[in-house]
């Protein structure tokens, strides 16, 4: 169970952005659009971002495209590739205030980076369990409502936990960027948005999100 400190003023300290014009994750144009968004968001925030992926191949493809572009701006990003120490990544992230990280499951919960070390979390895709996951298959075989009973609530909770990475003490601030348009096009989208600790939710195009971040950081 994800328990967030209710004494924090999440509405004032956490802004949630939902990208309204992203292609859906199963569309061919999605990955290129995500890569553009990641480059622009990291530049607007001057680093200190945590991007939480659900798929290693997608993460590595994004990293290979995004990292060289950010390097031009002296923005460093690292990736949770095969064989890389999770502890080492955590330590590096905490030690370098401007470092950004592309990560997988082990960073969705239980990772604390208070203060300016973490200025934003990006969730490219809602963390639904794969239909081929053995537990999902077993539940689906004996319950035709298994997706709504188990898969959806688990994904909602995991997203809430990821949002909780941002505000770890009373004076923390940050942005949560949700790049999965299914939050707006599918009936279950409200379950995700209603679970978030902040009610400051802005539905904008990717370009508008970047402009809003730039205004906030330059104002």
Regions found by a protein language model. Name each.
Residues 1-219:
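ASCE RecA-like P-loop NTPase motor cores
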């Amino acid at each position: 169970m994800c328990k967030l400190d209710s004494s924090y003023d999440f509405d004032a300290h956490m802004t949630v952005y939902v990208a309204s014009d992203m292609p859906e994750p199963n569309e061919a144009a999605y990955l290129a659009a995500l890569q553009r968004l990641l480059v622009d968001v990291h530049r607007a925030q001057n680093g200190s971002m945590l991007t939480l992926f659900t798929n290693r191949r997608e993460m590595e493809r994004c990293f290979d495209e995004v990292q060289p572009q950010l390097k031009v701006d002296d923005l460093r990003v690292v990736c949770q590739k095969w064989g890389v120490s999770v502890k080492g990544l955590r330590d590096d992230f905490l030690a370098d205030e401007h470092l950004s990280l592309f990560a997988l499951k082990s960073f969705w919960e239980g990772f604390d980076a208070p203060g300016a070390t973490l200025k934003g979390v990006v969730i490219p895709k809602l963390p639904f369990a794969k239909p081929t996951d053995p537990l999902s298959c077993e539940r689906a075989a004996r319950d035709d409502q298994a997706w709504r009973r188990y898969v959806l609530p688990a994904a909602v909770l995991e997203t809430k936990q990821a949002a909780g990475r941002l505000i770890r003490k009373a004076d923390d601030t940050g942005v949560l960027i949700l790049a999965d348009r299914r939050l707006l096009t599918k009936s279950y989208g409200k379950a995700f948005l209603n679970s978030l600790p902040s009610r400051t939710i802005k539905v904008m195009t990717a370009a508008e999100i970047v402009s809003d971040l730039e205004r906030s950081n330059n104002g």
